Amino acid sequence: MDSFSSSSGSPPNTEALMDQIKAQLAQAYAQEFLETVGNKCFAKCVTKPGSSLSGSESSCISRCVDRYIEATGIVSRALFSSTR
């Protein structure tokens, strides 16, 4: 039985199904975002990988991630405000 089937055989609750899909999409988006940001910031900030990050590498990664999060927020707000 898949996660969209109900045990009683009746059709699934549409609202509950939509909530489940939204939650799965949000989780997938967050995972993809973190992977992308992590890879880009690591590539930008860590020029000589070693056994640990230097202070400047750690600061660079932190600033880079903060900028990505801020930029994503700006773009999201712009998209949502233009659709209204």
Swiss-Prot record:
Instruction: List UniProt keywords, sorted A-Z.
Output: Chaperone, Disulfide bond, Metal-binding, Mitochondrion, Protein transport, Translocation, Transport, Zinc
Question: Any transmembrane segments, and where?
Answer: none
Mind telling me which Pfam families this protein's record contains? Answer: zf-Tim10_DDP
Name this polypeptide is given = Mitochondrial import inner membrane translocase subunit Tim13
Relate the protein's function as given in its record: Mitochondrial intermembrane chaperone that participates in the import and insertion of some multi-pass transmembrane proteins into the mitochondrial inner membrane. Also required for the transfer of beta-barrel precursors from the TOM complex to the sorting and assembly machinery (SAM complex) of the outer membrane. Acts as a chaperone-like protein that protects the hydrophobic precursors from aggregation and guide them through the mitochondrial intermembrane space.
Give the highest taxon in the source lineage.
Answer: Eukaryota
GO cellular component labels: mitochondrial intermembrane space
Q: Where in the cell is it found?
A: Mitochondrion intermembrane space
Which family is annotated? Belongs to the small Tim family.
Q: Give the main localization category.
A: mitochondrion
Q: List the disulfide bonds.
A: C41-C64, C45-C60
Query: Which GO molecular-function terms appear in the entry?
Result: metal ion binding
Q: What is the residue range of the motif Twin CX3C motif?
A: 41-64
Q: Which organism is it from?
A: Oryza sativa subsp. japonica
> Quaternary form?
Heterohexamer; composed of 3 copies of TIM8 and 3 copies of TIM13, named soluble 70 kDa complex. Associates with the TIM22 complex, whose core is composed of TIM22.
Give the record's GO biological process terms.
protein transport
Question: Keyword Disulfide bond, does the record have it?
Answer: yes
Q: Keyword check for NAD, yes or no.
A: no
Q: What is known of its domains?
A: The twin CX3C motif contains 4 conserved Cys residues that form 2 disulfide bonds in the mitochondrial intermembrane space. However, during the transit of TIM13 from cytoplasm into mitochondrion, the Cys residues probably coordinate zinc, thereby preventing folding and allowing its transfer across mitochondrial outer membrane.
